[in-house]
């Protein structure tokens, strides 16, 4: 729960706007909440999704959550909801009346990234799969930014201890 609150507090990016007719919703700053994933994506039960997506279809595909927690957002307007599923957490915001994914957190080694990296892999394995990390990386975190989002590998020594997909 504490990690979820940290992720919610660290989230940043533009607030979502009212959905339009069609598959995408455009924010005032030009970003879109979409039904099509961009950037680094995650596949679970055969369904590909990512951050900045309208959450309806991904949440439906994931099934009934084990638990969920809703609170007033401190990073956006509206409310944030964290959905807890087996092996992953999905965080959404509903500022304009629809939910948009702003964070996906991989909880254990039963799930992996699109390139096969999971909790417990080494720094060398992450770099072999994703290349050299962004300059904002450190000894405790490898960061890869792409298309308005970041894929973050938190480290404990030389091993991946958690994986998060976040909006920039």
How does the language model describe each region?
Residues 8-11:
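C-terminal motif of bacterial Sec signal peptides marking the signal peptidase cleavage site
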Residues 34, 92-93, 102-104:
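A short alpha-helix capping/helix-coil boundary motif
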Residues 1-5:
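Sec-dependent N-terminal signal peptides
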Residues 43-47, 110-115, 138, 150:
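Short, recurring structural edge motifs at helix starts
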Residues 39-42, 76-78, 105-112, 143-148:
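Surface-exposed aromatic
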């Amino acid at each position: 729960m504490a990690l979820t609150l940290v992720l919610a507090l660290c989230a940043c990016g533009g607030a979502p706007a009212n959905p339009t007719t069609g598959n995408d919703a455009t924010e005032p700053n030009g970003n879109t909440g979409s039904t099509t994933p961009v950037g680094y994506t995650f596949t679970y039960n055969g369904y590909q999704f990512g951050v900045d997506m309208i959450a309806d279809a991904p949440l439906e595909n994931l099934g009934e959550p084990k638990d969920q927690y809703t609170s007033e957002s401190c990073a956006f307007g509206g409310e944030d909801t964290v959905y807890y599923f087996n092996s992953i957490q999905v965080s959404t915001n509903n500022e304009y009346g629809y939910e948009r994914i702003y964070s996906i957190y991989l909880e254990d080694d039963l799930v992996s990234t699109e390139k096969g990296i999971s909790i417990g892999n080494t720094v060398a394995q992450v770099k072999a799969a994703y290349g050299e990390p962004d300059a904002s990386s450190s000894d405790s975190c490898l960061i890869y930014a792409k298309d308005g989002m970041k894929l973050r590998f938190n480290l404990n020594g030389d091993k991946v201890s958690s994986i998060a997909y976040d909006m920039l």
